[in-house]
Amino acid sequence: MRMVDIIEKKRDGKSLSKEEIEFFIKGYTNGDIPDYQASSLAMAIFFQDMNDEERAALTMAMVNSGDVIDLSKINGIKVDKHSTGGVGDTTTLVLAPLVAAVGVPVAKMSGRGLGHTGGTIDKLESIKGFHVEISEEDFIKLVNENQVAVIGQSGNLTPADKKLYALRDVTGTVNSIPLIASSIMSKKIAAGADAIVLDVKTGNGAFMKTLEDAEALAHAMVSIGNNVGRNTMAIISDMSQPLGRAIGNALELKEAIDTLNGKGPEDLTELVLTLGSQMVVLANRANTLEEARQLLNEAIENGSALEKFKTFLENQGGDVSVVDAPELLPTATYQIEYKAQSSGVVSELIANEIGVASMMLGAGRQTKEDEIDLSVGIVLNKKVGDVVKEGESLLTIHSNRENVDDVIKKLDESIEIQAQATTPTLIHKIITE
């Protein structure tokens, strides 16, 4: 088999066989196939697309390029949730203990975040003593005993994906549906999930800006999952404004605790219940979505979700007292109110830009080496569709420096007030095939 023949075949719009895709991934991962041939094939895929079989074959070739986590010793159906990322996306922190409280095993492997705020692990590490450096054996034991545990990403998972992603980044082939879908799904499958719930974001704060693109990506990932024996479904949710009200690590953790207490923001609560219901059904803990939602609501109302969160923190060395006293979480020195310059209705809160503003305060990382300030961030006091009076506080800036003129300038560009505006749709579509 020759790489040049594979490139020409895809260039001419023909389908590649499973063997050809495996030959490419294996050869590229071990260094036999040079970057220039790999980037040529990536560009051919970018223009000619791939069918469902090719996408599934590419995904599994990347899964098999490295270690695969074996979670078979964990009882029950392991359902993993993946979000394509957004601003103020606190869902994992609420979802994990909530679905665990109704018996769904959550074996979560999480990374550190690059971008607007930290990843799930960074947020949890704003709790004193909490750690994710646990052995695989302890991880499995904790999930069997308490239904939920989080471990840091370790081992050599999907090395082919890491190598191909770095190449796509510099060759103009990032925005290709088959390449994005196989990249995301290979990581989830290698991490041992039996079933997968995807939260595909759309809007200005998302990777997929239009509903059409988000739908295409969701269909691609669901089809890959179902083709390789992993029950998969996707929800397309809105990210034109930040989710919830908090953007920042400790601030989002506090919001997660409020939500588990039944006092969270409406949109975050709704998204968590929608995603959670799907997870409960996929794990066979309920027959219908209505029944699943009822179980989740009960777990919030009777306090079992919050109890589950406490046990989870305790199991991993975290100081549980913060759950009852969130003021013990890292707190910024200055709280600065950002006030409305006119009266009207909030018509735009550009998620992306607000994320950048929060990063300027130190809430996120630009490079892997950056230190995150866990205490800083932004809390929205108004959301799109809310009425506001001139001089009223739109949001609160939590900062460890007194001068935040640069952040205010950024916020000026990301907020609009008009005579009228409507609240955006939160959940656009649910995709099961």
UniProtKB/Swiss-Prot annotation:
InterPro entries (alphabetical): Glycosyl_Trfase_fam3, Glycosyl_Trfase_fam3_N_dom, Glycosyl_Trfase_fam3_N_dom_sf, Nuc_phospho_transferase, PYNP-like_C_sf, PYNP_C, Pyrmidine_PPas_bac/euk, Pyrmidine_PPase_CS
CC cofactor: K(+)
UniProt xrefs under Gene3D superfamilies: Nucleoside phosphorylase/phosphoribosyltransferase catalytic domain (3.40.1030.10), Pyrimidine nucleoside phosphorylase-like, C-terminal domain (3.90.1170.30), Transferase, Pyrimidine Nucleoside Phosphorylase, Chain C (1.20.970.10)
Residue numbers binding K(+): G88, T90, L243, A246, E255
Keyword Magnesium attached: no
Bound cofactor: record note: Binds 1 K(+) ion per subunit.
Stored SMART domains: PYNP_C
Residues annotated as binding substrate: R168, K187
Highest taxon, organism lineage: Bacteria
Catalytic activity: uridine + phosphate = alpha-D-ribose 1-phosphate + uracil; thymidine + phosphate = 2-deoxy-alpha-D-ribose 1-phosphate + thymine; 2'-deoxyuridine + phosphate = 2-deoxy-alpha-D-ribose 1-phosphate + uracil
Keywords, ordered alphabetically: Glycosyltransferase, Metal-binding, Potassium, Transferase
EC number in record: 2.4.2.2
GO biological process: pyrimidine nucleobase metabolic process; pyrimidine nucleoside metabolic process
Family the UniProt entry places it in: Belongs to the thymidine/pyrimidine-nucleoside phosphorylase family.
Chain's role: Catalyzes phosphorolysis of the pyrimidine nucleosides uridine, thymidine and 2'-deoxyuridine with the formation of the corresponding pyrimidine base and ribose-1-phosphate.
Protein name as annotated: Pyrimidine-nucleoside phosphorylase
Species annotation: Staphylococcus haemolyticus (strain JCSC1435)
